[in-house]
């Protein structure tokens, strides 16, 4: 099928709703046949229904949408690419592993899978690396703004950040959401936009600094990452109030 990742997402949601419908449909079956539901009826019927709908209806629709998306991305000018890169980068920091983060990541993975273009992967990877790196930076240079426990935890975010594990920032974001998330969004958006401005690309779905050897224009990717990290780290450091030990 040429439906691409959008069609795959639609198929997943469709399969879930069909299973819910089938459970209601067969609710009145004799209990002696209860064991057939999960091992025979649900899998076979849902596969048949989803497959039929995908082949005749959903597949062609999303194939056209996917083709339009590919053409749009191919014809996108630098200004639009920078804006989209900034949006994707910022989304990675909004909820740090939640729906916005996963939506940006899934979109970039889909574009990479369908077109082989890893430019948006560079944007989301930079955006996802910045929250933990910015926290690590802030806890290092603004010690009076964090407790002893936070400073110790902040050190581990250096490793988490370079590994593209955004979730390392969640404990800090939970305790101070406005300052941590707000600062991280700004830094991640700047970094995401810069990756597109400087035409960087990472043809890998994960890995952080450990896949930098695969990147196109890796030096510029690192510069974008550094700029975003410094901006977010400084915002966190100056925005937070000193803590009383």
Where are these regions (language model features)?
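Pore-lining transmembrane helices
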Residues: 1-31, 35-243
